[in-house]
């Protein structure tokens, strides 16, 4: 074979081989000398030289079409079909080549060729492609063209094939024994492939598959589990797919050669090195990490990939990239195993204990650094350190503003335990009251019961935000799988009518992923629990560049998370420029269709997503289940967050052994309702029998795990299956209709359910109808055509079923899986005006101030309203001439003042807005105010009552307070302000009631305290001393005499007590 080095095809019995790190060193002491061990001699057997079976170079065949062309041996034919022909190519020195232009053109190779090639063969050819990366064609395929290409449940009749795919931007090579469901291999992105020739080689060696491009290995899959003989047939096409709906390839192929036998150079040895590796050993401190490198020989081995493993992950764990981390004190062995051949090297690792104080301090530093201040959301006051796992407790200086750790917290019997143990729940001051005073949080950490470390941080709690009624809707969707279609488009309604969506930003995308895979799909948007902002969380996925298979293993490892106050101006929650956030574990191959919902029990958000799990961090062997034909499947996991920056470790949420994806949640009454797609092509257990459709469950515990789909589940502790196949296909979403949407019900119970059936479909219902749904009383029993797209119902309050309203059903024209959210008028306006060239922001809404004057009470009440009917904060200033008074608005937007009697004419009433600038000022005036008359009746009554009393009857202190109040009251007789008069009367009355009687017997008690009796007020008609100020003054000598007598009596009593005690002694 030209251009390819002939090397050994396999290794046999290499268990005696010793790599640079022998296992015999694992328990060697530090004082001992390392053993000298010769590297084991690797015995290799040179495979028989690959034998040429057939070749076509098409020389002299220019113009041939619709006929058979024999190979160089004359034994096998390549037959041109439906317009396929041989053409000369100037970019290939005018060589003739097989030319396929789509439109049904293809070539077929005799079945016998690949039957003769057997389980190990090599295919070489030159090729160019003119085909976009649509994912819907095959360039070359050999195997069984089955009668079932619609699902993966009927494996006996499924397509089974070895396939090569050549597009302008990607190459794919896979082998499968069950349609797309078990494709083994991968798809890779390549450059310079558009209409350009390249040399390719496909090598199949038993269950090993390799694809080379221009002599470079681009795809390799060891141990596919599928041999060519497992495919059941050897039908071979160039340019035609086994799938009836696929396209025909647009490309060319030349110099086709098929050999019996494989030509793969196998690894012969592997050695481990890295920082800290000394004498073939590694020592780490707990929580420390170091990067290991595996060197595979020979240099031209077909695969130098290795998988890493640990003999004890509780002591030392190792990531897929070779980073080893000490977990706890002890010993373990790290092993590197070649992907091909299973050649191993082992490295003994000793993990020494960490210093408890340093460990605790590191955990505290990380926990405090994670806090976003000032606080507008509950704080992630973790009970367990994220670095080292220290136990952390938090103490708040003001429990009314921020809660402390609940030291009596007990783990829940079902669902997630609170990772914050009651700490960090904030109580924001009311809108208009301003931010809180600083609260001191004291965090105390202890690592493994060691020395406690304490640190503090001051946190200000922000006042509540302004809230306005929702008067429209917004949506965020993506367009398609094609290049340029995996971005976020924003649409919004023209008015408060759900079926009036229009794509904004002149039809262009609003948000593009500038990091990671570069794609955004399956967006979900929710308003924050406190209402300040919107969060957007999306799948990091670009099918157009990486394909589906690779993205389920090595792509889609993060989620892209953004926040915005107006749905158009988005920033990353973790800071622009930082890319996505990894919330999944290293052994999870994808993080798809993320959504979130508020958990009332955890006081936090629960973020859930689908993942295909693997047995270890290398993500080479998927977790399989015999329920699905022993194939991998998608599970749904969740993590908890309070800020969409810091997430807890993910936990299993839904693992029934069958593929699930696209869960969305809505709480109605006391239940969470969960809509999820059955990703299986058919049944998923005993109850869900319809594949690729959406089923409904409910539970009172959002994070309760699901291991079985059953109507018999207790919804108090798990998820109860209510209905299968409620909605078609995938991407379910729900939204509650706005209160004033004309399609809403009178009791404000209208809902829209949506599903992505290759474009969004809308179904109307109510919360009451969803709540009625049970397995025995499903929605489709009560409304048989509920999900029948051929029988739409009229859009009206209380409608039940499929709605179609004009173009796209009145829904966004960017039709793929996204999210829908209610928005107030201020946000709706931004969505309509915003463009990338001229990004707008929320503008202040107008306000109106009205004032009503009550001449009888002289009260002037101002009422401020906003154009969007939202909440208000700030103050109203009342002014006339030299007089003014500023009064804070109450919760209803009102402020009241009592006008002084001297104020007359016109009073100005002005609302100045608030510090957040969200509402414009407004003002008004009140004319015709007449000067007030002061009513002195009550004041004179209280003065008369006070002057009727005798000072000698009361204690000195209480009488002094009365005298002061009386003086103020008499001064108020000349006041022009009724309020001043009323206050003086009230204060005088209070002083009278507070008088304390003087003791009548000098030996009784303390004269300053009196006997506690209340004074007797004059009877009606007694005018003595009324309005005679001098008559209220008493003879102070009387009071002094009474006090002196009390002192003498006390002295005598003291002497008597002393003499009595002496006698007793």
Swiss-Prot record:
Superkingdom of the organism of origin: Bacteria
EC number: 3.2.1.55
Transmembrane segments annotated in the record for this chain: 1040-1060
Compositional bias (Polar residues): 1014-1031
Residues forming coiled coils: none
Keyword Acyltransferase set for record: no
Main location: membrane
Family the entry assigns: Belongs to the glycosyl hydrolase 43 family.
Protein name: Alpha-L-arabinofuranosidase
Organism of provenance: Bifidobacterium longum subsp. longum (strain ATCC 15707 / DSM 20219 / JCM 1217 / NCTC 11818 / E194b)
Gene: blArafA
